[in-house]
């Protein structure tokens, strides 16, 4: 279930990342397939493809096509494929390993069709532990990137004119400030 939840979170990070790019008037140029192909990492390619699909009908994206003076966005926006992609690679590793483990014989002793009974160490859970450790590291990186986008979105000096903490009447209302504080803990 943890792996399935991680897959859902990976996809959700792309949806929220695309929404952040839109809210911050970012450009999707960094997700161009040619950039991803130059790196040659499968997860990165797939991440960028998902972001391009999510932004396909974006009116904000269209506003960048002609004469946009900006060269590049903040790392938290333009480096999503470079962070989300390795998370997908780790997720695929964990899915494969855990899938094989779910289909494995882990009893001890093992009894074979010919009646032979052999004691071994297939019960040891190191493979699953390592897969989940890799997944935990990957998900931490995904969360860190998301927190950086949240921070950029709520900080008035960096959020392209959105109200501070996304609240009307900042000072009186905290908006999503506590959500951002929670994300840093």
Sequence positions of predicted segments:
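Conserved amphipathic alpha-helical "coupling/scaffold" segments
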Residues: 2, 6-9, 16, 23-26
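Residues on a specific face of well-ordered alpha-helices
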Residues: 11, 15-18, 49, 160, ...
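Glycine-rich beta->alpha junctions and the first turn(s) of the following alpha-helix
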Residues: 1-11, 167-175
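Proteins with a high burden of low-complexity, intrinsically disordered sequence enriched in S/T/G/P/A and R
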Residues: 1, 26-30, 37, 79, ...
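Charged, low-complexity, helix-prone segments enriched in Lys/Glu/Asp/Gln
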Residues: 2, 6, 80-83, 87, ...
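Accessory "access/gating" subregions that flank catalytic or transport cores
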Residues: 21-144, 160
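C-terminal catalytic subdomain
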Residues: 126-185
């Amino acid at each position: 279930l943890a792996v399935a939840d991680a897959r859902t979170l990976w996809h959700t990070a792309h949806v929220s990342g695309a929404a952040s790019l839109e809210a911050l008037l970012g450009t999707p140029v960094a997700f161009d397939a040619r950039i991803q192909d130059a790196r040659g990492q499968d997860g990165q390619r797939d991440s960028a493809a998902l972001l391009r699909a999510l932004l396909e009908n974006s009116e904000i994206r269209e506003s960048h096509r002609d004469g946009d003076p900006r060269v590049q966005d903040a790392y938290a926006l333009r480096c999503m494929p470079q962070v989300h992609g390795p998370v997908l690679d780790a997720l695929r590793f964990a899915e494969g390993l855990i899938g094989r483990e779910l289909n494995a014989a882990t009893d001890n002793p093992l009894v074979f069709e010919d009646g032979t009974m052999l004691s071994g160490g297939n019960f040891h859970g190191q493979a699953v532990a390592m897969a989940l450790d890799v997944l935990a590291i990957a998900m931490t990186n995904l969360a860190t990137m998301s927190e950086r986008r949240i921070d950029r979105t709520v900080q008035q000096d960096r959020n392209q004119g959105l109200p501070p903490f996304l609240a009307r009447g900042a000072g009186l209302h905290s908006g999503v400030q506590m959500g951002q504080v929670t994300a840093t803990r």
